[in-house]
From Swiss-Prot:
Post-translational modification: Multi-mono-ubiquitinated by OBI1; ubiquitination is important for efficient DNA replication origin site activation. Ubiquitination levels are low in mitotic and early G1-phAse cells and are induced in late G1-/early S-phase, peaking in S-phase and decrease toward the end of the cell cycle.
Family to which the UniProt record says this protein belongs: Belongs to the ORC3 family.
GO molecular function terms noted in the UniProt entry: DNA binding
Listed name of the protein: Origin recognition complex subunit 3
GO biological process: DNA replication; DNA replication initiation; glial cell proliferation; neural precursor cell proliferation; regulation of DNA replication
One term under GO cellular component: nuclear origin of replication recognition complex
InterPro entries xrefs: ARM-type_fold, ORC3, ORC3_ins, ORC3_N, ORC_WH_C
Domain of life: Eukaryota
Gene, per the UniProt record: Orc3
Subcellular location: Nucleus; Chromosome
UniProt organism field: Mus musculus
Entry keyword set: Chromosome, DNA replication, DNA-binding, Nucleus, Phosphoprotein, Ubl conjugation
Modified residues (Phosphoserine): 523
Length: 715
């Protein structure tokens, strides 16, 4: 019997079933990020300023990545737009010749190779949809395999999305097509709807966002299939066959989003169906190239003060290269690193533009000055100073602030020079055999972050190979180095650019005598007529001695000077960041924290959550061993660890009820406890079901009322 406001609603005699709308459920409340910075545990007087600095810096980095992705996809999208605008020319001309009719049976199809980074496909296809709507046609539809198990659902989803793209969404006339959504999903009715809409569009309304496609009498319909590999073969075959029969009245263009290889088209479609497609291949930028560009714009630049240590960068790149190839995940990893840096490092308030950082140093409090003195890099710096200066740095706040401003400026100049020399060195080493210092600049960057690169065997090997470069190769590399140095707006390397230009001039001025000398020294001595072993060995020894004692040519001397110059640049400017005072202000080095958040082991995470819920819930009552107030699944998990291979459900339920009732201090004889026992039983069933879902137990027929305890490999 219902009570309260619903009593009158259930008083009917003839009705036996009553339907009620569910009560409004509050949405899950998400804690804003700034609340974490205002937490009492974060004992810092500038926590609000740190959060504001984080927000501004991330917005700058985010806008840079968005602009970068637009530039990377611009060429691909332009080619796709050209392809789509050239499709269905006979349809636009209303040509009725035999050749046109034959072509009407071929559906223009763009095979878009996006790569295996499936998580990035949505972003790319979303941008592509917007581009096509702005430049080609307003009728752009995207479908996923999970929404299209058969042709009926395929047409239903296709039709509903297509009608949402109709000419004027605010026009009442267009709503006449909505009846089609609920009644009929066939290609004939869709063609009729398209014909009616385009005729109305020609006379009454203008197509939304119809800019570059104004010459189209009837805009084409573009269908994008996300992850073509996920679609069933029969659905694709049926839809393509049906659509090809209606191309003369429904100008369809297909775009296949392919993650693997174009071969998938022939695997899913037989020749009789694939022959109905006019396929053109489009290749997006590879994942590794995309990663290199993102690193180049976000980290290998003095434009943004935030930097990653070697281990933190390796965590992000390893997740990218060995897990998902996702640029979006990599960018989220950088965002998480930035957030962790500003949250955990009190002096991250100085991780901003140099001018702003100097202003903030001037208003530092005594406690903030003490934070500077506690930095390990600053301690090492103080230890290397004269005694009088040490005392001033440790006792005089004014002198400390002035020196901090100077060190921050030195750190800024260090990064400018560092990245210029790094790019120059990469130009020299990226084309060497076997790539001793890596083929990608990120590999060279990680090596330079870790240690003094000139002490490594790889660097010495690379230098030996560079000393054997030909003149043309060396001149080409030096020209690229000049382009790198000229591209920098801040000239900090002194006369380095001029010296490289002087080297180029000297190479160009090598006269013919040096070439003849080089040829003469490289040619073998003449007159070796005897071929016996004794004379051959004697000749080889003479040639070796001649090579050892010969005077180097002008080219060899000049090449040696260039290599020595580059070696000195590396030793002067590619010092590891740990050698710089105050590097902790801008470098995030908590690689373990990053790994726990981004690359957690599922088994360890599950066991930790169930065995020690305090680790995640941060509830003081749950600290230590699992108390009675822990979540039900934690109690059930702890009890199941005490059982053998087969678990008696009755004993398990009684033990669970004993633990829970002890926590709630209920009287077993009371009426309330009898009602609660049913609730406890339901809670136990839910906990057992959750453990089964996680793979800890499974049903068994060996014994009645028993379940089998599982391990990760089996029973």
């Amino acid at each position: 019997m219902h009570t309260g406001p619903r009593t009158m609603a259930t008083s009917s005699v003839s009705k036996g079933c009553f339907v009620f709308k569910p009560d409004f459920k509050k949405r899950k409340v998400f804690v804003p990020i700034e609340d974490y910075f205002n937490n009492e545990e974060l004992d810092s007087e500038d926590s609000k300023l740190r959060f504001e600095t984080y927000s501004l810096l991330w917005q700058r980095m985010k806008s840079e990545t968005e602009q970068l992705q637009e530039e990377l996809n611009e060429n691909l999208f332009d080619n796709l737009v050209d392809f789509l605008q050239k499709s269905h020319p006979e349809f636009q001309k209303n040509s009725r010749d035999w050749g046109s009719q034959m072509k009407f049976r071929e559906i223009p199809t763009a095979a878009l190779i996006l790569g295996v980074n499936v998580t990035d496909h949505d972003v790319i296809l979303r941008s592509l949809t917007e581009t096509l709507q702005n430049n080609v046609t307003p009728y752009v539809v995207s479908l996923q395999a999970k929404d299209c198990p058969d042709v009926k659902h395929f047409l239903q989803k296709f039709t509903s999305q297509l009608m949402d793209c109709c000419v004027d969404r605010h026009s009442k006339e267009v709503t006449s097509g909505k009846a089609l959504k609920k009644t009929n999903y066939s290609m004939d009715s869709l063609c009729s709807w398209y014909s009616a809409v385009t005729q109305k569009a020609d006379h009454k309304v203008t197509i939304k966002k119809r800019t570059a496609s104004g010459h189209w009498r009837s805009p084409p319909v573009v269908l994008i299939l996300k992850s073509m590999e996920s679609f069933t073969s029969k659905v694709l075959q049926d839809f393509i066959t049906i659509s090809s029969q209606h191309l003369h009245e429904f100008p369809l263009i297909l775009i296949f989003g392919i993650a693997t290889s174009p071969v998938i088209i022939h695997r899913l479609l037989p020749h009789s169906v694939s022959s109905l497609l006019c396929v053109e291949l489009f290749q997006s930028l590879s994942c590794e190239q995309h990663l290199t560009v993102v690193l180049d714009k976000l980290l290998l630049t003095p434009q943004f003060p935030f930097k990653l240590s070697k281990k933190a960068l390796q965590v992000l790149t390893n997740i990218f290269l060995y897990h998902d190839f996702s640029i979006q995940s990599f960018i989220k990893g950088i965002k998480l690193s930035l957030l962790e840096h500003f949250y955990s490092q009190p002096l991250s308030v100085l991780c901003c533009d140099l001018s702003e950082a100097k202003k903030r140093v001037n208003v530092f409090s005594v406690s903030q000055c003490e934070n500077i003195r506690r930095l390990p890099s600053f301690r090492r710096y103080v230890e290397n100073q004269p005694l009088g200066k040490q005392v001033a740095l440790l006792t005089n706040e004014t002198f400390l602030k002035e020196k901090t401003q100077s060190l921050l400026e030195d750190l800024h100049v260090y990064h400018i020079n560092y990245f210029l020399v790094l790019r120059c060195l990469h130009n020299f080493t990226s084309s060497l055999p076997k790539y001793p210092l890596g083929r990608q600049i990120r590999e060279l960057y990680c090596t330079c972050l870790e240690k003094k690169i000139w002490d490594s065997e790889e660097y010495k090997s690379a230098l030996q190979l560079l000393r054997m470069l030909a003149k043309d190769e060396l001149v080409s590399i030096l020209q690229r180095c000049i382009e790198v140095l000229d591209s920098s707006t801040e000239k900090q390397l002194g006369n380095t650019t001029q010296k490289i230009k002087d080297f180029l001039t000297q190479f160009q001025n090598l006269d013919a005598d040096s070439k003849e000398e080089e040829d003469a020294c490289g040619s073998q001595p003449k007159g070796l007529q005897k071929t016996d072993l004794y004379h051959l060995q004697k000749s080889l020894l003479e040639m070796k001695e001649l090579r050892r004692t010969k005077k180097p040519t002008k080219f060899e001397m000049l090449r040696e000077n260039v290599m020595n110059f580059i070696d000195n640049l590396v030793r002067d400017y590619l010092l590891p960041p740990e050698s710089q005072p105050l590097h902790e202000v801008v470098y995030f080095s908590a690689a373990n924290t990053l790994r726990e958040h981004l690359n957690a082991a599922p088994r360890i995470a599950l066991h930790t959550a169930l065995n020690n819920p305090y680790y995640y819930l941060k509830n003081e009552e749950l600290e230590g061993c699992i108390p009675n107030t822990a979540p039900d699944i934690c109690i059930a998990y702890k009890l199941h660890l005490e059982c053998s291979l087969l678990i008696n459900l009755v004993d398990w339920a009684e033990a669970f009820a004993t633990v829970v009732t002890a926590a709630e201090k209920m009287d077993a004889n009371s009426t309330v406890s009898e009602e609660m026992s049913e609730v406890i039983h339901a809670r136990f069933i839910r906990a057992v079901s959750e453990l089964e879902l996680l793979g800890f137990i499974k049903p068994t027929k060996q014994k009645t009322d028993h379940v089998a305890r599982l391990t990760w490999g089996g029973c």
